[in-house]
């Protein structure tokens, strides 16, 4: 069984990687990925684009000499390594909480590693390959998982405690830089897990907590001393808060919470639409109650594995094998279908094993003692923490609270494993992991195939056959012929009109920072989005007025989402169109959007 599981897991990882591979050197989106590149290549750390994530992506981008294909590749490798580390942390729990005290063999651990690494590739389902704030948030959540799990079992050495606590603190810091709400939530959740779930003595838990706090404070101190000073950091988050609450959609924090709760309330119906009633199959473990007690563990393991396999087959048969265009948005609901199946199995197993002991459970008034004394309930706590991490990763996303969790599919898969282990104990880990490896691997591969076939606001990889220079640093990417013509015409028209690298550009299109990045334009110190003249004026008010008086304009005439320049350029002491002349009109092939480049007239 181990050999079969490993062979299947390796095959699915290779297949998923093959579906992702073209994305590294093919295609680029001037909207989202344009923003990611501008933020990672900003002139200084004081440039803020809804958070400080670009500051911490810049060293990675610089490491590969601003080569976009290599930057994407190293991002995928780092995410896979973080997923592998999270799987190793889960393996520590398997060993520490096993009934025999020995835990799984190397084959089972290797299978868990492959499951996590393959599931992490689901982050790229939309084929947005360039590292971003989402990438940092997921990386942080995986590092938190890798650091937290070993701290839930008795310590093997002080050195290991230091390492695990340090990784946990680093994960919270990285997650915070990706999404501040995620970083805060990860830190608070980890503290609760240490206090309530860890099997360590109070002294050891206190020591681990102090190490986490100390390392976290050291990271914050290093940031304030070496990266960005206190006043600039506060200003950066002030601007981030402005965009989070007063931006183009006018969302307040309360609005985001309300939207998230609304999507959660609709989750059961969406899961039912994706998987039918198959997730209820996990409750069939209750049938094991009719068997002799010595046969129940084997029956529970078999029923749990079979239920997960059937749910996976139902979902993938409906949505996955063809790599359908909508499959990426289906993936989080598929993850929750598996999660509900494992939850039903775990609750059923607990009903069989724990109901006779109910009086003992009720007599306990210390939740921490209860969680620490019963391995099955500890697995429930671990699964809950992983699901909450996925939710924190997705909170505040424009893609929707639940749909955004497609990127955190790896956390939902690990939570499913934890709940399945609550049902089967670690003795059933191998069987469960073989099924999860196949089900999750097929889902991720299908998601990536869907992304590869579609392309994200650009030509699909198989149509991207012409090399184009998409960066003022000379980085090249293979794009569709019409996209290559756009970049070529943009460069020639701008150069002929006298544009030089470092010239400011006021981007009043719906959202196309990649165009300015290709030209080498000086970006604003604060993100300017289309849709809202007040936000654009607010951003311009923070620029050097003398320098930006000579800024060029990038417009999208005819777009209902662009900004009317007559309502904005007064912030730099000009009027439109009297003070400008059009020098280029180009069509971006995606959605055939027309872009116009306007040069300021000499005084």
Write out the residue ranges for each language-model feature.
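Transmembrane-helix motifs of polytopic, lipid-linked glycan transferases
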Residues: 73-106
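Short periplasmic/luminal acceptor-recognition loop of GT-C membrane glycosyltransferases, typified by
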Residues: 444-533, 551-562, 586-591
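Specific aromatic-rich, kink-prone transmembrane helix
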Residues: 136-156, 164, 411
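Membrane-interface alpha helices of multi-pass inner-membrane proteins
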Residues: 161-180, 185-191, 216-219, 386-395
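Aromatic/acidic, Gly/Pro-rich catalytic loop(s) in extracytoplasmic/lumenal soluble domains
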Residues: 551-603
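Membrane-lumen/periplasm interface segments of specific transmembrane helices
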Residues: 208-293, 309-318
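Extracytoplasmic catalytic/substrate-binding loops of multi-pass membrane glycan-assembly enzymes
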Residues: 17-37, 45-60, 65-69, 230, ...
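Perimembrane helix-loop-helix junctions
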Residues: 185-221, 291-294, 422
């Amino acid at each position: 069984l181990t050999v079969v599981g490993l062979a299947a897991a390796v095959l699915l990882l290779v297949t998923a990687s093959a579906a992702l591979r073209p994305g590294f050197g093919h295609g680029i989106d001037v909207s989202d990925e344009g923003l990611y590149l501008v933020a990672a290549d900003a002139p200084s750390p004081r440039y803020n684009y809804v958070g400080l994530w670009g500051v911490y992506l810049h060293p990675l981008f610089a490491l590969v000499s601003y080569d976009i294909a290599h930057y994407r590749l190293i991002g995928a490798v780092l995410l896979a390594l973080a997923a592998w580390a999270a799987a190793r942390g889960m393996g520590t729990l398997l060993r520490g909480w096993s009934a025999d005290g020995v835990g799984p063999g190397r084959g089972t651990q290797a299978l868990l590693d492959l499951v996590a690494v393959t599931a992490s590739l689901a982050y790229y389902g939309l084929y947005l390959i360039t590292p971003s704030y989402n990438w940092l948030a997921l990386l942080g959540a995986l590092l938190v998982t890798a650091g937290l799990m070993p701290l839930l079992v008795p310590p093997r050495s002080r050195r290991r405690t230091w390492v695990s606590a340090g990784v946990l603190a680093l994960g919270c810091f990285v997650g915070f830089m990706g999404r501040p709400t995620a970083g805060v939530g990860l830190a608070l959740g980890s503290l609760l897990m240490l206090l309530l779930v860890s099997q360590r003595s109070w002294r050891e838990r206190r020591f681990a907590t102090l190490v986490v706090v100390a390392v976290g404070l050291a990271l914050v101190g290093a940031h304030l001393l070496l990266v960005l000073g206190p006043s600039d950091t506060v200003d950066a988050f002030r601007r981030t808060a402005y965009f989070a609450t007063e931006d183009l959609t006018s969302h307040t924090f309360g609005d985001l919470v309300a939207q998230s709760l609304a999507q959660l309330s609709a989750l059961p119906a969406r899961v039912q639409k994706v998987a039918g009633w198959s997730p209820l199959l996990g409750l069939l473990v209750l049938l094991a109650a009719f068997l002799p007690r010595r046969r129940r563990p084997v029956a529970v393991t078999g029923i749990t594995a079979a239920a997960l396999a059937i749910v996976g087959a139902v979902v993938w048969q409906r949505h996955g094998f063809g790599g359908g265009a909508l499959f990426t948005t289906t993936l989080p609901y598929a993850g929750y279908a598996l999660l509900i199946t494992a939850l039903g199995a775990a609750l059923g197993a607990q009903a069989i094993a724990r109901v006779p002991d109910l009086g003992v459970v009720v007599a306990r008034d210390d939740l921490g003692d209860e969680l620490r004394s019963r391995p099955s309930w500890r697995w429930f706590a671990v699964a809950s923490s992983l699901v909450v991490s996925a939710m924190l990763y997705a909170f505040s996303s424009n893609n929707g609270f639940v749909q955004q969790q497609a990127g955190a599919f790896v956390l939902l898969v690990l939570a499913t494993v934890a709940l399945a282990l609550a049902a089967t104990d670690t003795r059933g880990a191998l069987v469960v992991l073989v099924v999860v490896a196949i089900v999750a691997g097929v889902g991720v591969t299908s998601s990536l195939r869907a992304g590869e076939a579609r392309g994200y606001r650009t030509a699909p990889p198989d149509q991207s056959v012409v090399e184009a220079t998409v960066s003022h640093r000379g980085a090249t990417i293979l794009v569709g012929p019409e996209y290559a013509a756009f970049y070529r015409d943009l460069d020639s028209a701008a150069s002929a009109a006298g544009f030089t690298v470092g010239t400011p550009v006021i981007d009043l299109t719906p959202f196309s920072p990649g165009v300015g990045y290709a030209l080498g334009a000086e970006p604003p110190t604060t993100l300017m989005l289309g849709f809202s003249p007040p936000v654009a004026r607010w951003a311009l008010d923070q620029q050097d007025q003398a320098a930006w008086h000579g800024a060029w304009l990038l417009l999208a005439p005819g777009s209902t989402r662009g900004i009317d320049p007559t309502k904005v350029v007064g912030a730099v002491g000009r009027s439109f169109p009297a003070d400008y002349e059009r020098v280029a009109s180009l069509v971006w092939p995606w959605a055939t959007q027309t872009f116009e480049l306007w040069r300021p007239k000499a005084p």
